[in-house]
Amino acid sequence: MKKTLTAGVAVIMLAAFPAAAQTYNLTLSGASPGGLWSRIGGGIDAAIAKAYPGSTVTYQTSSGGLANIPLVSRGKVPMGLATDGELNAAVKGAKPFKKAIDNVRILFRVYTPASRFQQSFFAVTKSFADKHGIKSFGDIVSKKLPIRIAINRRGNMDADVGEAAMTLLGASRANIKSWGGQVVHAASKEIVSLVSDRRLDVVNFGISFNHPRVREIAKNVSPVLLSYGQNVASKVADQFGGEVCAVKPGEYKWTPNGAKSVCIGAVIVANANMDTKLAYNITKAMVEQIETFKNKSHRLIKKTATSKVLSQKGNAPHHPGAIKYYKEKGLM
Protein backbone atom coordinates (compact mmCIF):
# COMPACT_ATOMS: atom_id res chain seq x y z
CA MET A 1 0.00 0.00 0.00
CA LYS A 2 2.83 2.36 0.86
CA LYS A 3 4.58 1.61 -2.44
CA THR A 4 1.34 2.21 -4.35
CA LEU A 5 0.81 5.53 -2.58
CA THR A 6 4.39 6.59 -3.28
CA ALA A 7 4.02 5.75 -6.96
CA GLY A 8 0.76 7.69 -7.10
CA VAL A 9 2.39 10.75 -5.56
CA ALA A 10 5.22 10.47 -8.09
CA VAL A 11 2.74 10.45 -10.98
CA ILE A 12 0.98 13.50 -9.56
CA MET A 13 4.30 15.30 -9.21
CA LEU A 14 5.28 14.46 -12.80
CA ALA A 15 1.95 15.79 -14.01
CA ALA A 16 2.52 18.99 -12.05
CA PHE A 17 5.97 19.44 -13.57
CA PRO A 18 5.72 18.36 -17.24
CA ALA A 19 8.85 17.73 -19.29
CA ALA A 20 10.36 20.81 -20.89
CA ALA A 21 9.10 21.50 -24.42
CA GLN A 22 11.46 20.61 -27.26
CA THR A 23 13.57 23.52 -28.49
CA TYR A 24 15.96 23.70 -31.42
CA ASN A 25 18.89 25.96 -32.23
CA LEU A 26 19.60 25.44 -35.92
CA THR A 27 21.57 27.14 -38.66
CA LEU A 28 20.39 27.69 -42.22
CA SER A 29 23.05 28.52 -44.80
CA GLY A 30 21.63 30.86 -47.43
CA ALA A 31 23.18 33.54 -49.61
CA SER A 32 24.01 37.22 -49.20
CA PRO A 33 22.21 39.31 -46.55
CA GLY A 34 19.05 40.96 -47.81
CA GLY A 35 16.94 39.77 -50.70
CA LEU A 36 14.63 36.82 -51.21
CA TRP A 37 16.63 34.07 -49.50
CA SER A 38 17.32 36.00 -46.32
CA ARG A 39 13.61 36.81 -46.04
CA ILE A 40 12.83 33.12 -46.54
CA GLY A 41 15.27 32.38 -43.71
CA GLY A 42 13.37 34.80 -41.50
CA GLY A 43 10.11 33.04 -42.31
CA ILE A 44 11.56 29.62 -41.47
CA ASP A 45 12.91 30.96 -38.17
CA ALA A 46 9.49 32.37 -37.29
CA ALA A 47 7.68 29.12 -38.15
CA ILE A 48 10.06 26.93 -36.11
CA ALA A 49 9.90 29.35 -33.16
CA LYS A 50 6.09 29.33 -33.26
CA ALA A 51 5.98 25.53 -33.30
CA TYR A 52 8.71 25.09 -30.68
CA PRO A 53 8.86 28.21 -28.45
CA GLY A 54 12.41 29.22 -27.60
CA SER A 55 13.81 27.74 -30.81
CA THR A 56 15.90 29.72 -33.30
CA VAL A 57 17.03 29.25 -36.87
CA THR A 58 20.07 31.42 -37.55
CA TYR A 59 20.50 32.56 -41.15
CA GLN A 60 24.15 32.18 -42.15
CA THR A 61 25.32 34.11 -45.19
CA SER A 62 27.22 32.30 -47.92
CA SER A 63 27.85 32.51 -51.65
CA GLY A 64 24.70 30.47 -52.35
CA GLY A 65 23.56 26.94 -53.05
CA LEU A 66 26.79 25.81 -54.70
CA ALA A 67 28.47 26.40 -51.33
CA ASN A 68 25.54 25.33 -49.16
CA ILE A 69 25.22 21.80 -50.55
CA PRO A 70 28.83 20.83 -49.69
CA LEU A 71 28.44 22.47 -46.26
CA VAL A 72 25.40 20.31 -45.55
CA SER A 73 27.08 17.24 -47.03
CA ARG A 74 30.08 17.64 -44.73
CA GLY A 75 27.91 18.27 -41.67
CA LYS A 76 29.06 21.87 -41.24
CA VAL A 77 25.48 23.19 -41.11
CA PRO A 78 22.22 21.30 -40.53
CA MET A 79 20.26 22.99 -43.32
CA GLY A 80 21.01 24.82 -46.55
CA LEU A 81 19.12 26.60 -49.30
CA ALA A 82 19.76 25.49 -52.88
CA THR A 83 18.15 26.01 -56.25
CA ASP A 84 16.93 23.06 -58.27
CA GLY A 85 19.76 23.65 -60.72
CA GLU A 86 22.43 23.63 -58.03
CA LEU A 87 21.06 20.47 -56.44
CA ASN A 88 20.75 18.82 -59.84
CA ALA A 89 24.44 19.51 -60.55
CA ALA A 90 25.49 18.28 -57.11
CA VAL A 91 23.73 14.91 -57.27
CA LYS A 92 24.98 14.32 -60.82
CA GLY A 93 28.53 15.48 -60.14
CA ALA A 94 28.17 18.02 -62.94
CA LYS A 95 30.10 21.30 -63.25
CA PRO A 96 31.24 22.88 -60.93
CA PHE A 97 31.19 19.78 -58.68
CA LYS A 98 34.08 17.37 -59.19
CA LYS A 99 32.06 14.36 -58.06
CA ALA A 100 28.50 13.49 -57.17
CA ILE A 101 27.19 14.37 -53.71
CA ASP A 102 24.82 11.61 -52.64
CA ASN A 103 24.18 12.34 -48.96
CA VAL A 104 21.89 15.38 -49.10
CA ARG A 105 18.13 15.12 -48.76
CA ILE A 106 15.24 17.52 -49.25
CA LEU A 107 13.23 18.63 -46.22
CA PHE A 108 10.81 20.97 -47.99
CA ARG A 109 10.46 23.23 -50.99
CA VAL A 110 10.36 27.00 -50.52
CA TYR A 111 9.24 27.91 -54.04
CA THR A 112 8.45 26.16 -57.30
CA PRO A 113 9.78 26.96 -60.78
CA ALA A 114 6.23 27.94 -61.76
CA SER A 115 6.25 30.81 -59.25
CA ARG A 116 8.84 32.51 -61.49
CA PHE A 117 11.10 33.70 -58.69
CA GLN A 118 14.08 32.84 -60.88
CA GLN A 119 13.16 33.24 -64.53
CA SER A 120 15.61 33.86 -67.35
CA PHE A 121 15.10 37.46 -68.48
CA PHE A 122 16.17 37.73 -72.12
CA ALA A 123 15.83 41.05 -73.93
CA VAL A 124 17.45 43.37 -76.48
CA THR A 125 17.44 47.15 -76.25
CA LYS A 126 14.91 48.82 -78.54
CA SER A 127 17.54 51.06 -80.11
CA PHE A 128 19.66 48.04 -81.15
CA ALA A 129 16.58 46.12 -82.33
CA ASP A 130 15.33 49.05 -84.42
CA LYS A 131 18.75 49.71 -85.93
CA HIS A 132 19.23 46.11 -87.07
CA GLY A 133 15.65 45.03 -87.71
CA ILE A 134 15.55 42.46 -84.90
CA LYS A 135 12.29 40.63 -84.26
CA SER A 136 13.80 37.54 -82.62
CA PHE A 137 17.17 36.28 -81.41
CA GLY A 138 17.37 34.30 -84.65
CA ASP A 139 17.79 37.62 -86.49
CA ILE A 140 20.88 38.38 -84.41
CA VAL A 141 22.35 34.98 -85.25
CA SER A 142 21.52 35.04 -88.96
CA LYS A 143 22.94 38.57 -89.35
CA LYS A 144 25.95 37.75 -87.14
CA LEU A 145 25.53 41.02 -85.29
CA PRO A 146 28.30 42.23 -82.94
CA ILE A 147 26.21 42.12 -79.78
CA ARG A 148 27.40 43.08 -76.33
CA ILE A 149 25.52 40.58 -74.20
CA ALA A 150 25.54 40.19 -70.41
CA ILE A 151 25.01 37.01 -68.42
CA ASN A 152 25.48 36.45 -64.70
CA ARG A 153 28.79 36.28 -62.82
CA ARG A 154 31.23 33.44 -63.33
CA GLY A 155 30.68 30.78 -60.68
CA ASN A 156 26.96 31.52 -60.56
CA MET A 157 24.95 28.68 -62.13
CA ASP A 158 22.63 31.22 -63.72
CA ALA A 159 25.54 32.18 -65.98
CA ASP A 160 25.74 28.56 -67.14
CA VAL A 161 22.00 28.54 -67.84
CA GLY A 162 22.30 31.69 -69.94
CA GLU A 163 25.33 30.48 -71.87
CA ALA A 164 23.76 27.08 -72.56
CA ALA A 165 20.70 28.77 -74.04
CA MET A 166 22.79 31.12 -76.16
CA THR A 167 24.86 28.24 -77.52
CA LEU A 168 21.77 26.24 -78.46
CA LEU A 169 20.38 29.34 -80.18
CA GLY A 170 23.53 29.57 -82.31
CA ALA A 171 25.31 32.31 -80.36
CA SER A 172 28.15 30.48 -78.64
CA ARG A 173 30.83 32.53 -76.95
CA ALA A 174 33.16 31.78 -79.87
CA ASN A 175 30.54 32.83 -82.43
CA ILE A 176 29.81 36.09 -80.65
CA LYS A 177 33.51 36.89 -80.55
CA SER A 178 33.88 36.11 -84.27
CA TRP A 179 31.04 38.55 -85.02
CA GLY A 180 32.95 41.28 -83.19
CA GLY A 181 30.75 41.06 -80.12
CA GLN A 182 31.43 40.52 -76.43
CA VAL A 183 30.08 38.39 -73.57
CA VAL A 184 30.08 40.29 -70.27
CA HIS A 185 29.78 38.62 -66.85
CA ALA A 186 28.08 40.77 -64.20
CA ALA A 187 25.68 40.61 -61.27
CA SER A 188 22.13 41.73 -61.96
CA LYS A 189 22.60 45.16 -60.36
CA GLU A 190 25.63 45.83 -62.55
CA ILE A 191 23.79 44.56 -65.63
CA VAL A 192 21.08 47.15 -65.02
CA SER A 193 23.71 49.88 -64.78
CA LEU A 194 25.56 48.76 -67.92
CA VAL A 195 22.48 48.46 -70.12
CA SER A 196 21.12 51.78 -68.82
CA ASP A 197 24.41 53.42 -69.80
CA ARG A 198 24.07 51.93 -73.33
CA ARG A 199 27.09 49.65 -72.81
CA LEU A 200 25.07 46.49 -73.49
CA ASP A 201 22.74 45.44 -76.29
CA VAL A 202 21.33 42.18 -74.93
CA VAL A 203 20.76 40.88 -71.38
CA ASN A 204 20.18 37.27 -70.36
CA PHE A 205 20.03 36.56 -66.62
CA GLY A 206 17.78 34.93 -64.03
CA ILE A 207 15.59 37.14 -61.86
CA SER A 208 12.02 37.11 -60.56
CA PHE A 209 9.22 38.09 -62.92
CA ASN A 210 8.68 41.85 -62.98
CA HIS A 211 11.48 42.44 -60.48
CA PRO A 212 12.31 46.12 -59.79
CA ARG A 213 15.54 45.68 -61.79
CA VAL A 214 13.54 44.47 -64.78
CA ARG A 215 11.29 47.50 -64.43
CA GLU A 216 14.34 49.76 -64.26
CA ILE A 217 15.71 48.29 -67.49
CA ALA A 218 12.28 48.74 -69.10
CA LYS A 219 12.17 52.37 -68.01
CA ASN A 220 15.68 53.19 -69.20
CA VAL A 221 16.03 51.39 -72.55
CA SER A 222 12.55 50.23 -73.67
CA PRO A 223 13.72 46.64 -74.28
CA VAL A 224 12.22 44.08 -76.63
CA LEU A 225 11.57 40.74 -74.94
CA LEU A 226 13.28 37.75 -76.58
CA SER A 227 12.33 34.08 -76.36
CA TYR A 228 14.37 30.88 -76.00
CA GLY A 229 11.65 29.04 -77.88
CA GLN A 230 10.02 25.83 -76.64
CA ASN A 231 12.73 23.48 -77.95
CA VAL A 232 15.73 25.32 -76.51
CA ALA A 233 13.93 26.13 -73.24
CA SER A 234 13.05 22.45 -72.81
CA LYS A 235 16.64 21.31 -73.40
CA VAL A 236 18.08 23.90 -70.99
CA ALA A 237 15.46 23.11 -68.35
CA ASP A 238 16.29 19.39 -68.58
CA GLN A 239 20.01 20.09 -68.33
CA PHE A 240 19.71 22.28 -65.24
CA GLY A 241 16.80 20.68 -63.41
CA GLY A 242 14.35 23.50 -64.05
CA GLU A 243 11.10 23.85 -65.96
CA VAL A 244 9.95 25.63 -69.09
CA CYS A 245 7.93 28.70 -68.16
CA ALA A 246 6.41 31.55 -70.07
CA VAL A 247 5.72 35.24 -70.20
CA LYS A 248 2.36 35.76 -71.87
CA PRO A 249 2.09 38.34 -74.68
CA GLY A 250 1.38 41.70 -73.08
CA GLU A 251 2.11 40.46 -69.55
CA TYR A 252 4.96 42.96 -69.48
CA LYS A 253 3.30 46.28 -70.25
CA TRP A 254 6.39 47.60 -72.05
CA THR A 255 6.45 44.94 -74.76
CA PRO A 256 3.77 43.06 -76.71
CA ASN A 257 6.05 40.03 -76.97
CA GLY A 258 5.58 36.82 -75.06
CA ALA A 259 8.46 34.44 -74.40
CA LYS A 260 9.39 30.86 -73.55
CA SER A 261 11.96 30.82 -70.79
CA VAL A 262 13.50 28.67 -68.05
CA CYS A 263 12.48 28.89 -64.40
CA ILE A 264 14.26 27.41 -61.39
CA GLY A 265 12.82 26.64 -57.94
CA ALA A 266 14.52 26.23 -54.56
CA VAL A 267 14.52 23.76 -51.67
CA ILE A 268 15.87 23.30 -48.15
CA VAL A 269 18.32 20.41 -47.90
CA ALA A 270 19.72 18.49 -44.93
CA ASN A 271 22.27 15.74 -44.52
CA ALA A 272 20.94 12.22 -45.02
CA ASN A 273 22.18 11.47 -41.48
CA MET A 274 19.96 14.12 -39.87
CA ASP A 275 17.99 12.53 -37.03
CA THR A 276 14.67 11.27 -38.40
CA LYS A 277 12.70 12.83 -35.54
CA LEU A 278 14.37 16.21 -36.11
CA ALA A 279 13.61 16.09 -39.84
CA TYR A 280 10.02 15.09 -39.05
CA ASN A 281 9.58 17.90 -36.53
CA ILE A 282 11.05 20.55 -38.82
CA THR A 283 8.75 19.45 -41.63
CA LYS A 284 5.76 19.32 -39.27
CA ALA A 285 6.50 22.83 -38.04
CA MET A 286 6.70 24.24 -41.57
CA VAL A 287 3.39 22.69 -42.64
CA GLU A 288 1.48 23.47 -39.45
CA GLN A 289 2.89 26.99 -39.18
CA ILE A 290 2.77 27.79 -42.88
CA GLU A 291 0.84 31.03 -42.29
CA THR A 292 3.62 32.25 -39.99
CA PHE A 293 6.19 31.28 -42.62
CA LYS A 294 4.27 33.19 -45.29
CA ASN A 295 3.66 36.28 -43.16
CA LYS A 296 7.26 36.57 -41.97
CA SER A 297 8.85 35.74 -45.32
CA HIS A 298 9.08 37.59 -48.63
CA ARG A 299 5.82 39.05 -49.97
CA LEU A 300 6.05 36.78 -53.03
CA ILE A 301 6.21 33.70 -50.80
CA LYS A 302 2.95 34.81 -49.20
CA LYS A 303 1.27 34.49 -52.60
CA THR A 304 2.63 31.07 -53.53
CA ALA A 305 3.47 28.91 -50.49
CA THR A 306 1.10 26.03 -49.72
CA SER A 307 1.47 22.71 -47.91
CA LYS A 308 1.49 21.00 -51.31
CA VAL A 309 4.32 23.25 -52.49
CA LEU A 310 6.36 22.40 -49.38
CA SER A 311 6.09 18.68 -50.19
CA GLN A 312 6.78 18.96 -53.92
CA LYS A 313 9.58 16.75 -55.24
CA GLY A 314 13.01 18.02 -56.23
CA ASN A 315 16.27 16.77 -57.70
CA ALA A 316 17.29 14.69 -54.67
CA PRO A 317 15.24 12.31 -52.50
CA HIS A 318 13.30 13.64 -49.54
CA HIS A 319 14.58 12.87 -46.06
CA PRO A 320 12.78 9.85 -44.50
CA GLY A 321 11.61 12.03 -41.60
CA ALA A 322 10.02 14.49 -44.01
CA ILE A 323 8.47 11.67 -46.04
CA LYS A 324 6.92 10.21 -42.89
CA TYR A 325 5.16 13.47 -42.05
CA TYR A 326 4.04 14.20 -45.62
CA LYS A 327 2.54 10.71 -45.95
CA GLU A 328 0.70 11.08 -42.64
CA LYS A 329 -0.91 14.25 -43.96
CA GLY A 330 -1.67 12.88 -47.42
CA LEU A 331 0.81 15.26 -49.06
CA MET A 332 2.92 12.51 -50.58
Regions found by a protein language model. Give the residues of each.
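An extracytoplasmic/periplasmic, membrane-proximal ligand-sensing/linker region
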Residues: 169, 197, 202, 207-220, ...
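Bacterial N-terminal signal peptides
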Residues: 8-16
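Bacterial N-terminal signal peptides that target proteins for export
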Residues: 1-8
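Bilobed "Venus flytrap"/periplasmic-binding protein-like clamshell domains
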Residues: 25-51, 55-59, 117-120, 124-197, ...
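Pocket-flanking alpha-helical
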Residues: 42-46, 58-103, 189-195, 200-203, ...
